[in-house]
Amino acid sequence: MSQLVREFGKDNKSLKEVTESLAQFVSGLERQECAICFGWGHLANSVPPKPPLIRPAGVTLSGKLSGGLSRPSTSLNQLLLGPTRLRCHPGPAMGGRRSGGRICLGDPGAAAIPTTTTAPTATHQPNQQRQQVIPQQMHGLARQYQRSNLVGNVAQYPFGSVANPIQQLISQFLSFYNSQSQYILLIHTKLDRKLHFVDQTGSF
């Protein structure tokens, strides 16, 4: 959390400026097609355990078919999950999973891993309607905070404080993803390395 605030709140920006930057970042997720990893270890208990990876029958991780024939080289994601790919907008619900001491939100460009687990949903809408509502809700949160009248600056709010508006914003995003749980394959990309979002200590 501290690294996240430092990235968006450096140079003593106002809270409104910080949330505007964060809103722009979130609205660009579907273009980035990246995973986001936050070092919020205390939220890991709310994330369901990940299922085992399932790959198509007759295909090995090396990319060879059972009969000894070679198949064209492809990414591990495509090899394990086949041709189906899901995107952030429009697309099915996305969820998170635990990776080490971190909360990892799934890659919008990755496909869902088959599972028989019935995940809780925040609404009782039909699946097709819910697929259309999810990205609207996600971007709606960003727009809501972007328009809000925030005063002061980041330094006035201690890390971990319930009153910290930045923490509240990220918490809502994490809660939203977790409530719409779908198991997806996490793909680490340049995003977390470039912006240094990951707090290796798993704390604020």
UniProtKB/Swiss-Prot annotation:
It comes from the Eukaryota. This is Uncharacterized 22 kDa protein in overamplified macronuclear DNA POB4.
